[in-house]
Amino acid sequence: MKKYDLSTNEISDNLRYLELLSKQYPTINEASTEIINLQAILNLPKGTEHFLTDIHGEYEPFIHVLKNASGVIKRKIEDLFGNSLMQSEKKSLATLIYYPEQKLEIVLKQEENIDDWYKINLYRLIEICRYVSSKYTRSKVRKALPKDFTYIIEELLHEQPKGIDKYEYYEQIIRTIIDTDRSKEFIVALSKLIQRLVIDRLHILGDIFDRGPGADIIMDTLVEYHSVDIQWGNHDILWMGAACGSDVCIANVIKNSLKYANLDTLENGYGINLLPLATFSMDFYKDHPCNIFLPKMDCDKKYSINEINLIAQMHKAIAIILFKLEGQVILRHPEFNMNHRLLLNKINYAEGTINLNGKTHKLKDSFFPTIDPKNPYELTYDEKELIDKLKTSFINSDKYNKHVRFLYSNGSLYLKFNSNLLYHGFIPLNEDGSFKKVKIADKEYKGKELLDKLDMLAREAYFSKDKDDSDNKKDIMWYLWCGASSPLFGKDRMTIFEQYFIEEKETHYEKKDPYFSLRDNEDICKKILKEFGLSSPESHIINGHMPVEEKNGESPIKANGTLLVIDGGFSKAYQPKTGLAGYTLIYNSFGLQLVSHQPFESTEAAIKEETDILSTTLLLEQVVNRKRVEDTDVGVTLKQQIDDLKMLLNAYRKGLIKQQNKI
């Protein structure tokens, strides 16, 4: 912080700003008091950050991990009641905190002496609440309190019932809560307050959407969350592109949903009408088996044989439309360097084969009633009409657009936060580790400049009013989804067509960007950090996107701890590969911890049987001196505010600004 005594010239240079600041702090006393308050905050322990990534619609385990704070709440219970409660009591108390409304329903049916139960658990919850709130200012805790119980909870948190008078006062408050039949509401309020206080900031490193059945539920949760940021993943950007009105992104979103038989998010979550697609697919593929388009049934929902066959027909119909639309985008943008993905013109439609790289492959399905071999990328009249109907449904969904606007307002391609660099995918590199140049329009970008440019273009695609250039702006969203140099994808190609239609596995290969072989090199990682203005020895890159195959010995800790990959397999589709069901990275005042999670059974089992996710915590880094608010980004801002207030004090004392004392 700056010196306390400043020259008249220094103050005069900032006089206009200080006059504005004096409106908020009109006297020496008020400015001094605020300096004292801010200085006190700087000395508090830093808040706890939680990092999660690649949730892929798996809303039940995601919400449970938020509720149990990746095992932190269980540890708090152990800290306080480790020697005074039985294991069964600790499990019940934890479940009450995670799911207070549902647990209370069960207790009310089973408990004979409910008033005693209320009293015991109110005392326990208050003790936990006092414990988890101790690192925050009263003001911050007050802002987190429910309005109905603000005064009472404040009294209970800050009273220490040791003296006789205080004990009686404390006990009378509890008794009155029970007597006025407000125990249930009070328990719910305390439980949710505990959940809120144990996670000060939530970071979501992308891929909220696709595969799992509840991306809309996850988004509802995030919209209401007290402090969250999002680093967009390629699956998120696809849904954002669909909201921009991009035909190719809309087709991709629907194709991905049908691939995993995940219609709930589209139809029930967002009210997207898929009936026109169902009608279209039955018209063109009614008597065609569409076997290679049968969905992957990872979801718990049961479908009849007829429903599965219809999903397969819809899947094929939208996939063919998608390949046409992708071809149109590639032809519009030679700078994307994606001509190798123009495949429909390489098919021999008479023989049912395709020639790739000089080799002819037999297609597993060669029934293409909507493709004109002479003009394979042109949509038929019916296909154009279908896409227009689907686009109208996407654009007019209020809830969907509310969620997309939240992704824009709370999200970005990358984030620098508390000396860490957060991004979902990767930074494009050359084989020698230098930053890869990527051409956008008529200019080349690399490193941080590339991500900044693409972030700006992603925002323009949704918010721009320029209708004449709207297609080009929307096309960048598709490139971010699957482009070879998109910092969200990371492979030279996305071989969706080959995986559908060609048996030979070598055609399915997708070469990864050099980043993924170089990210274990500490010098490379430090070079990336430096590119983004981070040079602290305590800085880390926190990364998602590529699942860590821990069961095969892969470590999430790269480059001597400089880079941490935290995609552990929230998505059920990846759990056989990872051997886990996700990671949470926790950064608190004591250091960094990586928590690995085993698969979550169900919310119902968590409530009725009091089962919890089995989590294992690995201590990555432990600091010698506990991290304080002054060591964080918030601390930098507070120090600047203190400097400004000290300058204001100087201005008052030198008579350059008059105090506004009330008479």
From Swiss-Prot:
Enzyme class: hydrolase
InterPro entries: FBPtase_class3, Metallo-depent_PP-like
Record key words, sorted: Carbohydrate metabolism, Hydrolase, Manganese
Pathway the protein contributes to: Carbohydrate biosynthesis; gluconeogenesis
Record bears the keyword Nucleus: no
Required cofactor names: Mn(2+)
UniProt GO MF annotations: fructose 1,6-bisphosphate 1-phosphatase activity
Catalytic reactions of this protein: beta-D-fructose 1,6-bisphosphate + H2O = beta-D-fructose 6-phosphate + phosphate
Listed EC numbers: 3.1.3.11
Protein name listed in UniProt: Fructose-1,6-bisphosphatase class 3 1
Origin organism lineage: Bacteria, Bacillati, Bacillota, Clostridia, Eubacteriales
